[in-house]
From Swiss-Prot:
One of its GO terms (biological process) is phospholipid biosynthetic process. Its main location: cytoplasm. Catalyzes the reversible formation of acyl-phosphate (acyl-PO(4)) from acyl-[acyl-carrier-protein] (acyl-ACP). This enzyme utilizes acyl-ACP as fatty acyl donor, but not acyl-CoA. It comes from Leptospira biflexa serovar Patoc (strain Patoc 1 / ATCC 23582 / Paris). Homodimer. Probably interacts with PlsY. It is an enzyme of class 2 (transferase). This is Phosphate acyltransferase.
Length: 340
């Protein structure tokens, strides 16, 4: 089972990405195609003990930057690492692809070379959000589609429910719509119409949920649906707040010798909390609804994130996520309609 990894598009160069690929091969027995500058990647690989039969390097000469126009770049830079990595999936050489680069470019390459699954109106980005207890809440759309129709959001709910159940083992995922109140008629026109659609689908729809419910502080919910404009703001705000809290805590500890002593006693607790809130534990966010499996990572993805991204991609293949999506959307086609 081969997974393609765009090794060149991260913020900090390819070394951490290569290390993550080596760890995935070593710990999970998977195979990885690293796409990027061949000589540079081979030089980095010399630093590690790895199975040469399970890691290969695919040469590419271009890198799509964070400031490049996605739609233009994926066509003009066909030898870029992200495009070549996606094409390995399109050519059936790999079961999925991970890129820590330009999100828009990864999406554009996936749509251009992989295409949508039959019946999918718009592919959403599904981001795992850590909460107080249990598996993460799946937030979608986390940035792929800033303007959505109710039919899009209803499909997002179905795809997110499958992701939560198959990958995180939630037996009967609770699905909610992110809104400005729990009452049935709260929200804008799109969310109210989406509410009516989701009531018709035979799954565990719990109605409207509020922002606090994402983190386990309010209503119990496993999948939260919104458009990509709101979802991306929520995702970035969540990441920023978590980082800020850790910084405040660290700075406060440094100001007092007593606090430093207490911190030493609580070191294992702090480590456990950090691990629970670390995005790297989930690898990245899946672009659901495309042929093949596509995961988008942070530009700052480290070796742990890459290792887990490769693992999650392989688990998606084992659990036949795309087959489940295809089946469920087919079942509910009369409810969801065919609005493009």
């Amino acid at each position: 089972m081969w997974v393609a990894v765009d090794a060149m598009s991260g913020d900090y160069g390819p070394e951490g990405i290569v290390e993550g690929a080596v760890l995935a091969v070593r710990e999970f027995g998977l195979s990885v195609s690293l796409v990027g500058d061949e000589q540079e990647l081979l030089d980095i690989l010399l630093k590690f003990d790895y199975d040469t039969e399970k890691i290969r390097v695919i040469h590419s000469t271009e890198i799509i930057g964070m400031n490049d126009s996605p739609s233009i770049a994926v066509r003009a830079m066909e030898d870029s690492s992200v495009v070549k990595a996606v094409r390995l999936v399109a050519d059936k050489e790999c079961i999925g692809v991970f890129s820590p680069g330009n999100t828009g470019a990864t999406m554009a390459a996936a749509l251009l070379h992989l295409g949508r699954l039959p019946g999918v109106l718009r592919p959403p980005i599904a981001a795992p959000i850590p909460r107080e207890e249990g598996p993460p809440v799946i937030l979608l759309d986390a940035g792929a589609n800033v303007d959505c129709k109710p039919e899009y959001l209803a499909q997002f709910a179905i795809m997110g429910e499958i992701y939560s159940r198959e990958l995180f083992g939630v037996k009967n995922p609770k699905v909610g719509i992110l809104s400005n109140g729990e009452e049935d008629k709260k929200g804008n026109t799109v969310s109210v119409k989406t509410f009516d659609l989701l009531k018709k689908i035979p799954f565990n729809f719990v109605g409207n949920v509020e922002g606090r419910d994402l983190y386990g502080s309010g209503r119990d919910v496993d999948v939260v649906v919104c458009d990509g404009f709101i979802g991306n703001i929520v995702l970035k705000a969540t990441e920023g707040l978590a980082k800020s809290i850790f910084n405040v805590l660290r700075n406060s500890i440094r100001q007092s010798s007593l606090a430093q002593t207490g911190a030493l006693l609580l070191k294992s607790t702090f480590t456990a909390v950090k691990k629970r809130l670390d995005y790297a534990e989930y690898g990245g966010a899946l672009l659901l609804g495309v042929e093949g499996i596509c995961m988008i990572g942070h530009g700052s993805s480290n070796a742990l994130a890459v290792k887990n991204a490769v693992r999650v991609i392989s688990e998606c293949a084992k659990h036949q996520i795309n087959e489940r999506i295809r089946e469920r959307l087919g079942e509910y086609k009369t409810i969801l309609g065919d609005s493009n």
